[in-house]
Amino acid sequence: MTTHQCKDYQELSKVAAEWLIQRIRKNPLSKIGVATGNSPLEMYRNIAKTRNLNTKSLSLFQLDEWVGLSEFQHSCMSYIEKELRIPWEIPSERAYYFSPGLTPLDSKIQAEEAANSMEKKLDKKGPLDILILGMGKNGHLGFIEPDENWPSDECYVSELTPATQNHKMISSENTPPEFGLTLGIKSILEAKEILFIVTGTEKKSIYSEWLKKVVTPKLPASILWKHPRVSLITDL
């Protein structure tokens, strides 16, 4: 694991963008798994403003998604459309989402079908070239939540913890989602390279725990210590 220590979020976003730009230029056909939320947001926007960068041939794969939202605009898919696919000028057929259409997944049964469908897409397309990840306040990775045991290796429907249900992304939902869809451990560990972005003062405590290098399902992001090619970029 390589570590890039940054002084603040602005520097972190710049360093992360430069990291990703180098790899896009090396392989314009890269298959990229993308996280949402505040951690990678400015990195995505920096890349959209980069001149002479061909992003049109990239493929995007969604990392996770809420289940049971009342508004599409609160979804991870909406975020990816707004902040990545459209600004990066990537054709819609090269964006692989859990939901078959621009609508929220409204039930656990529908979400389970979507998980199976995404797993088949990943099996067909091969491992991700790059996977962009952040860490939740409780140490989650995607929607792989802290637990006593590791979950399914494949894409699955996760029961969300209260910490995740309080995420700013869904703060205007009257009822927080009970479930989330997420890529599984297999897709994470099979990714050729991982960009791990850790930022936010509220994550200092869990980041300190993560640095102990104890791999445990109680801190899902600890699984990254088993991956051979992780680039950590942090301002903590």
Predicted stretch roles:
Residues M1-I32, K49, A95, E112:
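N-terminal glycine-/serine-/threonine-rich phosphate-binding loop
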Residues V34-S39, L133-K137, T199:
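Glycine-rich beta-strand-to-loop/alpha-helix junction loops that act as flexible
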Residues N46-T55, S78, P146-C155, K213-V215:
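A glycine- and small-aliphatic-rich helix-loop capping segment at beta-alpha/alpha-beta transitions
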Residues T50-S59, W88-I90, S187-A191, L224-H227:
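Short, conserved loop/helix-junction motifs that constitute active-site signature segments
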Residues T55-I132:
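Ligand-binding beta-strand-loop-alpha-helix segment within the catalytic cores
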Residues L141-I185:
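Class I SAM-dependent methyltransferase SAM-binding "motif I" and its flanking Rossmann-like core
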Residues L183-K186, E190-L236:
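ATP/nucleoside-binding phosphotransfer catalytic cores, i.e., glycine-rich phosphate-binding loops
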